[in-house]
Amino acid sequence: MINVSFLGLMSGISVLLKTTVIVVGIFEGSNHLEDNGALEGYNDKIMEIVNGYQSFDGKFAEVLPIIGLEKDFPVVVVIGLGKSEDFDENKALKVGGVIYSELNRMKVPDASIVINTDSNVSANIGYGALLRSFKFDKYFVEKKDKNSVYLNKLVLFSKNDPQEVTALFNDLKAEGESIFLARSFVSEPPNILYPETYAQMIYEELSKVGVTVEVFDEDYMKANQMMALLGVGQGSAKKSRLVVMKWNGGDESESPIAFVGKGVTFDTGGISLKPSKGMWDMKYDMAGSASVVGIMRTLAARKAKVNAVGVVGLVENSVDGNAQRPSDVVISMSGQTIEVLNTDAEGRLVLADALWYTQEMFTPKLMVDLATLTGAVVVALGNNQYAGLFSNDDAIANQLIVAGNESGEKLWRLPLDEAYDKLIDSSIADMQNISTKGYGADSITAAQFLQRFVNGVPWVHLDIAGMAWDYEGTEICPKGATGFGVRLLNRFVSKYYESH
């Protein structure tokens, strides 16, 4: 993780001259740099060079390196900030990520950033660089050049009190460290991360920041009649686990917010076997659980004034002679029976018991579940654009949508309706785990299935199948695991439910 620090703009040019690279911003169409005078007599020279490049006019994320401004003068990198009226937290995040990528490509060890913005935006520029600096390279015997990290230190010069900016950044950094943890979990191969080892990793990592963690085995789940969850893992040599995380930062009398995650550490599809091509991606079928771990760690790390509980069901969906069969009937913790027609629609079975358990044990004020639940949501919304949102509560759904827009982790609400609910009625049990009546609406019928295990509690289901893994990378996330949901839920809690 890159080291980010802050100084005041009044520190002067002498401090800037000690760095390898100076990064300065310019808004689209502007005739001056956003340095607030920090570069003193060099502005005109830089602008003369900038104006000489007709292809560069300050559009968002445009980059122009300037070498040899003067003898022994640092390399100057001018970055376009786009239109000034559009520059906000999310743009600042992306600018920070672009700066990191460009400087790392240039193989420089350190740099200073001079962009004349307020404290919050300055902190987010640093945060964007931090988020983009994630690397999962532990399994390389020799680091290849493209996987090397060169940039280790960034200093941002702010017009505001650097202590104020640092305080804002430290809260963001706590969130960022949690996102890195979530990304790392999702990136781990399934022979390393499986229910037993994953549960132990959660315990070790979250105990460090004050989260109370309990790990429950299969005997405990059998005693609680969690046969929907256990049925998913019965074809695997890896034993299923239930992990409960608690953070009590609010009033003792206050009911907690609950986060529930699907943790299928590898999904073969079971007897309803997936095609071999692309099955390697199914190590990230536990991304919902990683997001729950991430938000619980974030709340504890920044000492959030809220009570929260996280519950994740951890299973491996594999195939052997004891594997669950299409047409099996299982009894869930709720007492409702489920006809399992497709063993590859397993995540909803895990969540069915995890949701019911959460309500029974903790009486939460609301529940949010996260799951890479359906490929259909990717068909509907695409990759890395919007997660699907389903809810029985309009107010909470709208709060999450606002939090998503503000954090950049956007949500699109999809319907719940009796017309869809009846599609999962079974002829021999209370319900079946897929619709067999025609085609389409698979994400909706999956959400309808989950709703049958919500007992009078405000609830939101987030289908993050298209958001958990980025095959190309973004300004703030390299190719791979995204940690989607942590920033969204942290904003949701701090904006609407935390005591300030």
UniProtKB/Swiss-Prot annotation:
Mn(2+) 1 binds at residues 267, 344, 346. Its cofactor is Mn(2+). InterPro entries: Leucine_aapep/pepB (IPR011356), Macro_dom-like (IPR043472), Peptidase_M17_C (IPR000819), Peptidase_M17_leu_NH2_pept (IPR023042), Peptidase_M17_N (IPR008283). Mn(2+) 2 binds at residues 262, 267, 285, 346. It is found in: Cytoplasm. GO terms for cellular component: cytoplasm. It catalyses: Release of an N-terminal amino acid, Xaa-|-Yaa-, in which Xaa is preferably Leu, but may be other amino acids including Pro although not Arg or Lys, and Yaa may be Pro. Amino acid amides and methyl esters are also readily hydrolyzed, but rates on arylamides are exceedingly low; Release of an N-terminal amino acid, preferentially leucine, but not glutamic or aspartic acids. One of its GO terms (biological process) is proteolysis. The active site is at residues 274, 348. Keywords: Aminopeptidase, Cytoplasm, Hydrolase, Manganese, Metal-binding, Protease. GO terms for molecular function: manganese ion binding; metalloaminopeptidase activity. Its EC number is 3.4.11.1, 3.4.11.10. Its main location: cytoplasm. Presumably involved in the processing and regular turnover of intracellular proteins. Catalyzes the removal of unsubstituted N-terminal amino acids from various peptides. Belongs to the peptidase M17 family. This is Probable cytosol aminopeptidase. It comes from Ehrlichia ruminantium (strain Gardel).
